[in-house]
């Protein structure tokens, strides 16, 4: 399903340009080669599918320029999941490279979704997580990649705030929840919410809220993500987060401006984890964003 992605000419709409600048700048992103993120996964969605309880810790390592990502440990302490492209393939390997299981075109293997009876196998869970996290960690810069259509739509009022919105259509070459998604930004141009409807869960509409934007190696990433059901009126049911994602650390590997060597964008041993000035103080994950 996926092919290599490289940077194209970005949509220069005023909102997208400001969002890119607020998240670290497109010119700086052009030098990024890879990212590594420590993630804690939770929520009742996973146990419903027969998977481990909340608190699963994963490390995601991804190529910033094409959809290639590894997640680990996965299923066993010495195993990792690898999503690659050309052709699209998901494999589970040991950390020393021994193949355990592999599937071409993993997306086509998902069964019809029924929350009461559906169970996913390891390949399917790994694919869902891998495709999601590659997109989460490369956005909003991946909005400038070839084949991605971006336009500003009418604003949205929520919680006494007005959020500007980008409607983004991803190409079929991008492994993602679904093609058409909407992203909501506050007055600091920080992402507050994203709406989509994953094809592999019967296009169930969700509202994915992001909290606590932090700066790591010069780029801004949400530290907390909470995913809720969304009604036909666009209102999210925030009484329960079906999926929770917490990002403890992101390390950005970038090429220096002189192009002489690959190294971190920053010379610091530890990434900059300063709270972004536009971050919302949210102590209860059920509190409306």
Residue spans for each PLM region:
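N-terminal mature ectodomain segment of secretory-pathway/periplasmic proteins
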Residues: 2, 6-8, 21-103, 152
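Flexible, processing/modification-adjacent segments and terminal tails
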Residues: 9-14, 94-174, 201, 267
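Catalytic loop of the DD-peptidase/beta-lactamase superfamily, centered on the K-T-G motif
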Residues: 74-120, 235-262
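Gly/Pro-enriched, hydrophobic low-complexity segments
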Residues: 160-259
């Amino acid at each position: 399903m996926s092919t290599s992605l490289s940077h194209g000419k970005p949509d220069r709409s005023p909102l997208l340009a400001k969002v890119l600048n607020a998240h670290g700048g497109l010119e700086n992103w052009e030098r990024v080669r890879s990212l590594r993120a420590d993630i804690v996964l939770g929520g009742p969605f996973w146990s419903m599918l027969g998977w481990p309880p909340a608190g699963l810790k994963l490390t995601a390592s991804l190529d910033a320029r094409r959809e290639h990502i590894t997640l680990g440990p996965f299923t066993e302490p010495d195993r990792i999941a690898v999503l690659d492209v050309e052709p699209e393939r998901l494999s589970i390997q040991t950390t020393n490279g021994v193949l355990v299981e592999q599937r071409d075109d993993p997306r086509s293997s998902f069964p019809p979704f029924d929350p009461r009876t559906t169970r996913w196998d390891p390949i399917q869970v790994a694919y869902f997580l891998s495709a999601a996290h590659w997109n989460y960690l490369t956005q909003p810069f991946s909005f400038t990649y070839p084949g991605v259509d971006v336009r500003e739509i009418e604003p949205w009022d929520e919680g006494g705030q007005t959020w500007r919105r980008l409607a983004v259509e991803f190409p079929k070459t991008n492994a993602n929840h679904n093609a058409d998604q909407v992203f909501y930004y506050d007055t600091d141009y920080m992402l507050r919410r994203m709406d989509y409807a994953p094809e592999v869960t019967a296009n169930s509409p969700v509202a994915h809220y992001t909290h606590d934007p932090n700066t790591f190696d010069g780029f801004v990433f949400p530290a907390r993500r909470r995913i809720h059901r969304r009604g036909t009126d666009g209102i999210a049911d925030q009484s329960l987060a079906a999926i929770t994602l917490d990002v403890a650390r992101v390390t950005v590997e970038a090429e220096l401006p002189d192009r002489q060597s690959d190294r971190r964008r920053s010379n610091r041993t530890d990434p900059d984890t300063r709270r972004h000035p536009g971050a919302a103080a949210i102590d209860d994950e059920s509190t409306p964003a």
